[in-house]
Amino acid sequence: MKFGKKNEIQINPLKYNFALIGESGIGKTTVIKEYCEKLAGEDGYIFLEVGKEDGASAISGINYITCPEWDADYDEDTNTMGFNTFIEDVVENKATDWKDLKVVVLDTYDEIFSIGEQEVIRMHNKENPQKRAKSINGCFGGYGAGLEKTIEIVLNALWSLKTVGVSFIVIGHTKSKNIIDPVTGEEYVQLTSNMTQKYFNAIKTKVHFLGVAAIDREIIRKSTGKKDNKGNDIKKGIVQGESRWITFRDDSYTIDSKSRFADIVDRIPLNADALIKALTDAIKAAAIKSGADIKILEEIQAKADQAKAQQVAEAEKAHKSQKELDIAIGEIVDFFTKNKTDIEIIKPILAKCKEMGYSNPKEISDLDDAKTILAMTLK
């Protein structure tokens, strides 16, 4: 028997994992909001303002939820919810409550690991009450095990979104870092993520596109009107002008960017239209190289999306039915436990179970049967 299938490139940029990092206040959140609205519509995206991130409060019309911790029910007054709680709700209710959702934006990625570490500490202390940890380095045996566990729970949460057809975009911050070239031994400065390298690499290896937003400043040397002790004019750098760019490829490796699509442009202006065009053109170029017809490919993928939505809806319905069945069986078992010494009460219910083909209530596999039995316990 033959296994596997031939991959077909998907043209829609939202089908791919994307990360955008840049300095604070450069406009990352605004650009990604506009990018999502143009590709997914106003109801097709949502921002998760994670931890202490607060960028959405300054952007009019943005769809967002604040996620200050890992698990917490939704609070309508504060518009807050646990990060993982939100993810689980989307996965469980995609076909109903979240039917239009296509992409979740995590703002910022570094804050996700902050709340993830607190969850890992909680998990460790629950499993090891006699050897409690106060920091991530003391969790699960130490030696980096706590960091690995944090990466595991974060990536598991993100990948669960993909199982129901929802992609993710991550936003992060940057810093300048001194790097030593492994071949020449020379040191150079690279613009990269400001988070722990292990955490950054965990997502860098998973995304298809990593863009780095930065300001390109034109600086000129201008006289101050003063002279030094040798009589020379003292000059200082003046910013003549500046422009904001997203870099996807940098041959000098001074910008820590990435693309899995070979034909991506090196850099683009920091705006949504340029971003959409750059990603779409790179994806289409890869598809054309493989001999695909773009129009036919789009039609095939539209049908595949419909089939995926139907599959998710059926799985969601089955999951909810099973959940309802489990709850009903639990209540029936509780009833039998409380009344196990009163044979007159439980005898007719046991008889009904046997009539339905079950030797005991725990064997009930049909929701309607469970509802019938449960109704008898309430009389």
For each predicted feature, which ranges?
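Conserved GTP-binding G-domain of TRAFAC-class P-loop NTPases and closely related GTPase folds
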Residues: 180-315
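Walker A/P-loop
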Residues: 29
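Short glycine-/polar-rich loops that comprise or flank the Walker A/P-loop
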Residues: 42-44, 164-166, 205-209
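Conserved nucleotide-binding/hydrolysis micro-motifs of P-loop NTPases
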Residues: 51-55, 109-111, 174-178, 216-219, ...
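Conserved nucleotide-sensing/catalytic segment adjacent to the nucleotide-binding pocket
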Residues: 56-129
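P-loop NTPase motor core
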Residues: 108-198
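Interfaces that engage single-stranded nucleic acids at replication/repair/recombination sites
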Residues: 2-22, 26, 37, 46, ...
